[in-house]
Regions:
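Solvent-exposed, amphipathic alpha-helical segments
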Residues: 18-20, 46, 97-109
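HTH DNA-binding helix-turn interface
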Residues: 1-16
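Hydrophobic alpha-helical connector segments
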Residues: 17-46, 56
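Amphipathic alpha-helical packing segments from all-alpha helical-bundle domains
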Residues: 31-35, 39, 55-80, 89-101, ...
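Short, hydrophobic secondary-structure boundary micro-motifs
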Residues: 48-50, 59, 115-116
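C-terminal peripheral helix-coil segments that are non-catalytic and often amphipathic
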Residues: 73-77, 88-89, 105-139
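Short linear capping/connector segments at secondary-structure termini
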Residues: 18-20, 50-57, 80-85
Length: 139
């Protein structure tokens, strides 16, 4: 595995299996996301140079594509019968990009929030976007 592939695999924010509707709409971050953020915090010293190097755009593009693919598959499975106000590919790539940008900022700022707090915050952002996209109301 190349160093680029190793870096890209580091950015899997959860299990590579589909997330259920309940998990996608939960207020709690999935354990896999928390574990990934912890791992990224521990790996910050070698991640930063790679994310700022000459291949960073290629690396980030591949990370975004992989995350978007995972997110879109989960959305399609969890909301198979529902109509989205936002095309699912647009929704998935937007959530993937937001998560990558959040992690970049977090690493650049020397982790001003714990991995747990960051994961919970992103889960809430993701939940709000998904709920809006599918027109879901609070019960």
């Amino acid at each position: 595995m190349s160093c680029h592939e190793a870096l890209i695999s580091t950015f899997s924010f959860g299990p590579r299996s589909l997330r259920s509707r309940t998990a996608l709409l939960s207020l709690k971050a999935p354990p896999g996301m928390i574990a990934a953020y912890r791992h990224l915090a521990e790996a910050r010293t070698w991640l930063e140079p790679m994310l700022q190097g000459k291949d960073s755009l290629l690396i980030l593009r591949r990370i975004r594509a992989g995350l978007a693919q995972e997110i879109e598959a989960s959305l399609r499975a969890a909301f198979a019968e529902a109509d989205s106000r936002i095309p699912l590919d647009v929704l998935a790539v937007s959530l993937a990009g937001a998560q990558i940008t959040l992690v970049q900022w977090w690493l650049e700022q020397r982790q001003p929030h714990t991995p747990e707090n960051l994961a919970e915050a992103f889960q809430r952002v993701q939940r709000a976007v998904i709920r809006d996209a599918f027109g879901l109301q609070d019960a």
